[in-house]
Amino acid sequence: MHRTVKRILCGIGVALAILVIAAGGLYLTGYLQVYGLTSGYQYLDREERARIVFSRNKLRDIDETLDRVHREGKILCVNGAELRAALASKPKALVYIFTDGCTSSACLPLSTIGAYAHKIGAEPYYVAIDLTPGLLKRTEPILSIDYTHYGTKWHDSFYEAFIKDLTGRSTDEEHFNLVLFEKGRIVSIFSTEKLLQQP
């Protein structure tokens, strides 16, 4: 009886090891794509990568640059500090930090955020956390986090650093994905859940 159980457990262990090795191999060769672990840049093909523009701390006029990049069908990657500095000249700006393709109730459509921003007299800015092919199909001007600025491709690391640069806060302090600025000063930080609770 013990031998049978031992053989079954050994067989299960071998099967799991083979499965892990196979999944690792598929991931390393690019056949298995897991979004949310890294920036997503490595999953973009050559044409898609050519449509990603890294500002490299040279962002001067956010609206002019974002408009030009958007007309070219590209995405502008920025770091948190330069985005905050660029918003200093804006009377009121609402930054929505989102994950493309998210279906959670915490993720609202960009059109909903845009309508809310206009309702409160703010200019909306959409910042994608990860780079995905779907972002390139969006009709709105899209910003994304410049993971290269933070020296890592790992999602949690560059996201935390971006939030710290943009707001001076840690993602551990509270959950938020909306930041309201007035002339570069943070007026409010809140989540889409709180936005939905407003009358």
Where are these regions (language model features)?
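Thioredoxin-like thiol-disulfide oxidoreductase module
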Residues: 132-174
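A short, hydrophobic beta-strand/beta-hairpin element that forms part of a small beta-sheet core
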Residues: 173-191
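Short acidic, S/G/P-rich loop/turn micro-motifs used as interaction or catalytic elements
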Residues: 99-105, 131-133, 186-187, 194-195
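A short, well-structured juxtamembrane/interface segment
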Residues: 73-85
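Short active-site neighborhood of thiol/selenol oxidoreductases, capturing the structured segment around
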Residues: 83-113
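Structural microenvironment flanking redox-active thiols in thiol-disulfide oxidoreductases
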Residues: 105-145
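Loop/turn elements at helix/coil->beta-strand transitions in domains of secreted/extracellular proteins
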Residues: 90-94, 120-123, 182-183
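N-terminal targeting signals for export/organelle localization
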Residues: 1-72
